[in-house]
Curated annotation (Swiss-Prot):
This is ATP-dependent Clp protease adapter protein ClpS. One of its GO terms (biological process) is protein catabolic process. HAMAP family: ClpS. Binds to the N-terminal domain of the chaperone ClpA. Belongs to the ClpS family. It comes from the Bacteria. NCBIfam families: PRK00033.1-1. Involved in the modulation of the specificity of the ClpAP-mediated ATP-dependent protein degradation. It comes from Streptomyces avermitilis (strain ATCC 31267 / DSM 46492 / JCM 5070 / NBRC 14893 / NCIMB 12804 / NRRL 8165 / MA-4680).
């Protein structure tokens, strides 16, 4: 039988670690609820929802609604992930488009 040779092992350059590829939630960073603009809900209704659910004054609710309308989105609350999940579900219940994310400024 002849001599069998194996190719030399390749050196693989380390690129990104799993932490760099996947954003890992940081426990000290608060979460926020973001309401996005939609073509369905009236501005007066969005203001009403912010006043009713969050207890915001008419002025604050109107400012947030105008941010949603003109900027396309507004941060309407912040806190723990569980609290923000509850707020997002409530906004969905009112028919608003809302998401949550960590506030990584």
């Amino acid at each position: 039988m002849g001599r069998v040779t194996a190719p030399a092992p390749l050196e693989i350059e380390k690129t990104e670690s799993a932490e760099e590829v996947f954003a890992v939630p940081e426990p000290d960073v608060p979460w926020v609820t973001i309401v996005h603009n939609d073509p369905v809900n009236l501005m007066s209704y969005v203001t009403y929802v912010f006043q009713t659910y969050f207890g915001y004054s008419k002025d604050k609710a109107t400012k947030l609604m105008l941010d949603v309308h003109h900027k396309g989105r507004a941060v309407v609350s912040s806190g723990t992930r569980e609290e923000m999940e509850r707020d997002v579900q409530a906004m969905h219940g009112y028919g608003l488009w809302a998401t949550l994310q960590q506030d990584r400024k």
